[in-house]
Amino acid sequence: EPAGFAEFEPSAAPDAAGALLIPTHGFVGVTSLTLAAATAAEKFGARFSVATGAINIQPAPNGRVTVRTADATLDADRVILAAGSWSSQITVEGAAAVPVKPIRGQLLQLQAPPGALRRVIWGPDGYLVPWPDGSVLVGSTVEDVGFDETHTHDAVERLKAAAVSLVPSLAGAELASVRTGLRPKGPDDVPVLGRSRVVPGLIYATAHYRNGVLFTPLTVALVSDLVFDRAPDPALRDLDPARFGGL
């Protein structure tokens, strides 16, 4: 009810017809999460090469897999193709390209007035996230523009308008930054996750679209089962790369 909504979120627009409260709804800092995961992996022996990208994947003798980069050739028992929006840019010998394309998303960070927002709010034209430093994140656009990661004035204005429609006090908020990213979208908006039928030892984990970070724990569990040859989760049937053929 409107009265209850105002009690939980006093700064919200007074003309709201109502709202659904989800007490467990949260958010995560992607950069911090990624750095934490990488640090933890290094402690267990992982090595990272961030200055070069994979170019080609092909089968190797004895069921192994070869990955070629611009300056190295690597062999492994298992290789996971998890290149997000760039997954189709890595050629897999004998296989079709992964049917994934980039969808640009733009997001604003506003320097909000104190107490502007208590919780994550979703509305018809966007969402707001109260950040620990007092700022508010405003998201986000969905744009089919290829690999263009520039931000646009039109998107900034539309997102600011969406923010003000949800929390009017944000009308005077200063724009701190604009972020852009590319989401990996598959033809059916469902992740591509499973073993390759063409290259033994190759595992696909891509096309998570707008929910890659949210799906991280599940993706890790499913891929781990495949890497270590454990019984696969039945959920993988709906995610199988074979549904597109040639993978």
What kind of feature is each model-predicted range?
Residues E1-F44, S49-V50, N56-A60, K185:
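Flavin (FAD/FMN) cofactor-binding and adjacent substrate-gating region
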Residues R64-V65, S135-V136, I203:
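Hydrophobic residues embedded in beta-strands of well-ordered beta-sheets
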Residues I55-D75, V79:
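Conserved beta-strand-loop-beta-strand element in the redox core of flavoprotein oxidoreductases
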Residues A19-A40, S85-W86, A155-A162, H208, ...:
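Mid-domain beta-loop-alpha active-site segment that forms a flexible
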Residues T73-L74, R78-P200:
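Active-site substrate-recognition segment that forms the wall
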Residues E1-P2, V50-T52, T69, S177-R179:
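Short loop/edge segments at beta-strand edges and connector loops
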Residues V30, V167-L247:
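C-terminal catalytic lobe of FAD-dependent flavoproteins
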